[in-house]
Amino acid sequence: MKSFPRLASTAFALLAMCGSLNAEPLKIAYSDWPGWVAWEIGVQKGWFKEAGVDVEFLWFDYVPSMDAYVSGKADAVCMTNGDALVTGATGKPSVAIIINDFSNGNDMIVAAPGIESIKDLKGKKVGLEEGFVSHLLLLTGLEKAGMKAEDVTIVNTPTNETPQVLASKAVDAIGAWQPNSGQALKVLPGSKPIFTSADAPGIIYDVLAVSPESLEKRKEDWMKVTRVWYRIADYMADEANLDDVLKILSARVKITPEEYEPFLKGTAILSLADALKRWDTAPGLGTIYGSSKVADDFNLRFKVYEKSQDAAKYLDPSFTKALAAEKAK
């Protein structure tokens, strides 16, 4: 008599799995950043299928990936916590369910030869994309150096054009993230990073941001995606897998593993335990809530949007916490 409930529960579980796999695939827009290219590991190894969820990853440049999300072409997008606020205030709200990483050196202020520190930028021109993370990074560097935003002149420059602009000597420094920051160092001999995200860890968190509608309709599928992500993070944390990780990630962006390795070093991929700490609500850059408050203040100051955004509406730690509870059993 006891076997019937067990058989019934097994049947229901199989039906649920089949239903998930037969549903429309979850569509995730992603772009060229190590913490997001890392999803490719799960794709290549078939881990999403093993988890019982169908996911389609859509490759874009960064800004077009957010545009795709806003226009409804994707259910989720990989973006920074600060840009999630901008996207929500000006286009479409989202909810971050995974903190993939924080930038740990890949975002840089790269200066021309002869400029040795942030203080040397006084009265100089800096090329960067106004209102984006590189702008926030520069302001953070200026503040740490006891300077003001008015001490430099911002030349609004698309991030992917910053290497050429620095090489042309139209500006004295640029703000960009990898691979553009690295390219800037290559094209102008003698240039150097004078401030990076490693000098302000937590200024930029990288997240998986999901549409509230998709999250409500397919919560269990997004939980499966969360499980796969932390399987990826664990795989990346094992030094024995480094060659395979570099091979997979570099192939996605069409460069060599040797060229890709510095990008990986400048990205702090978060383990489950690390992520739980970053989901704390304490102020400061050590948490995503504190970091998002800094980003919100920046966005208001530079009129990226007019009304303050409540970070709590954009962040949902429950998926990470639920996985931690599963693993603790």
Q: Where do the PLM segments sit?
A:
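Bacterial N-terminal signal peptides that target proteins for export
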Residues: 1-9
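Cleavable N-terminal signal peptides
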Residues: 10-11, 21
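Sec/Tat signal peptide C-region and signal peptidase I cleavage site
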Residues: 17-23
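Short, glycine-/small- and polar/acidic-enriched structural segments
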Residues: 24-165, 172-178, 194-195, 202
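Predominant activation on well-ordered alpha-helical scaffold segments within soluble catalytic domains
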Residues: 40, 85, 139, 182-185, ...
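Pocket-lining segment of extracytoplasmic ligand-binding domains
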Residues: 81-83, 154-155, 161-257
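Secondary-structure end/capping motifs
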Residues: 216-304
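Conserved C-terminal helix/tail region of periplasmic/extracytoplasmic solute-binding proteins
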Residues: 291-329
